[in-house]
Amino acid sequence: MDRISNLPNEIICHIVSFLSAKEAAFASVLSKRWQNLFTIVQKLEFDDSVKNQGSLMDFVNGVLALPVTTRISKFSLRFDSFLKRKLETGLVIGPHVVNRCLCNVLKRGVLDLKLEIYGEDGYLLPSEVFTCKTIVDLKLTSCIFAESYVIDVIPENAFLPGLESLFLKSIWFSDLRGCAFQTLLSACPVLKTLTIYDVQWEKWKWSRTVSSATLERLIIQRTEFTYFNGSDFKSITFDTPSLTYLKYIDFVPEEYPVVNLDSIVEAKLHLILTGNQDYPVRYLGREDDPITSNPTNLIKGLRNVEILHLSTATAQMLCFFPRETLPEFVNLHHLTIGPTYYECFNWRLLPILLKKTPNLKTLMIKGPLHLYYRDFNDDEEEEEPEYYCECSSGCNCLLSCHMEVLEISHYRGTTKELEKLKHFLGKLSCLEHVKLGVWASSDKEKLSITTDLLMLPRASVNCKIQINFS
């Protein structure tokens, strides 16, 4: 008997996990003992972007050659383009070859299925993917600039009873007879996490509804903001009563008819208004650029949130709607605004937010307290318009605020920033900890900034200032 056969079963199974499908198939016929150990293959993966990976056909044949009793826990396939493969190798490897392999894998109790199909030549998933009873984690990835992954039909018997996590990247849904997207969600009775990356709603044909009674985490992230055509971007409904986490990066549609986010705990928002629904608003309020987006219902639907992250664009957006738009966030204890590297935070919003957050404990500003920008045609730094960076001297709500932690990530020690910080420290009587990320070019500047900060009067005797120089 060889040395490997003397190893414990656990170690042999670990070795097996590093074999290709073809090697696993060959190894399974070495002996009855090895064949029994091959009843479960932990992971099979093919990535044609990796050199010396071997051919896709060999991989497929290896999968098909596995004993019928072999189970596969995790299956991953990354394939660039059927057309490209034909041009490079002369082999005709069509979608039917990949789908034959997939259908075989789906019969082997697969738990984790990851498919990355890139290219411009189109690809349709086999319907068996949507009736697999064992999948727990499903990831489907395509290319944002091509219709290479379109789901236009979900079978009537679609049912994924074990699916807990669904990841969709650059996937389009197009069903002229109904809504393939909602049909898919309805087929997932225990779905907990949904990620929609590289989303382009305006290219979908769907009911404009995200509905799931079990969903707990939802990530919607648009990555392409340049070629936006919002002519058919009218509304989005969120009916997710169990949702606790929301990350939402996108343009704002004309309306949110229904928003059910009663269980929300944490939300991260980067939302951009549009004018005439065809391009981002850059000069809000102009008569020739009317605002057609309306986030009112969405913001009101977040009233139970405990941790809220607002991008600068989102915070600025809220300034263009009546104060009544903001509900009272009675559960909110942590508020983050920013980053503010390229956009300025409209400070007029802060008093409004503080009045609406009676139980706020932590305020984090990812950026400076006062913004300067550089005109690329000039070497001088200039201040932003005063209405953006007006000081908080009139912010009487600070006197009744129970904030305990204030964090500023890009403090520079300028006169305007020092003045603004003075108002915070002089009025926040419950403040315990101030964290400042400070940029300084010399030891002399560090000493000057530190001295100025330590000299500031504080309403709270327990307030400590932590300075982190970079």
Swiss-Prot record:
**Database matches in InterPro entries:** F-box-like_dom_sf (IPR036047), F-box_AtFBL13-like (IPR053781), F-box_dom (IPR001810), FBD (IPR006566), FBL60-like (IPR055294), LRR_dom_sf (IPR032675), LRR_FXL15/At3g58940/PEG3-like (IPR055411)
The F-box domain is annotated at 1-53
**Pfam families listed in its UniProt record:** F-box, LRR_At5g56370
Give the keywords, sorted: Leucine-rich repeat, Repeat
**Superkingdom, taxonomy of origin:** Eukaryota
Please list the residue ranges covered by the LRR repeats: 114-142, 143-170, 173-198, 225-250, 287-312, 342-367
Which Gene3D superfamilies does this entry report, sorted A to Z?
Answer: 1.20.1280.50, Ribonuclease Inhibitor (3.80.10.10)
The protein, known as: Putative F-box/LRR-repeat protein At3g58920
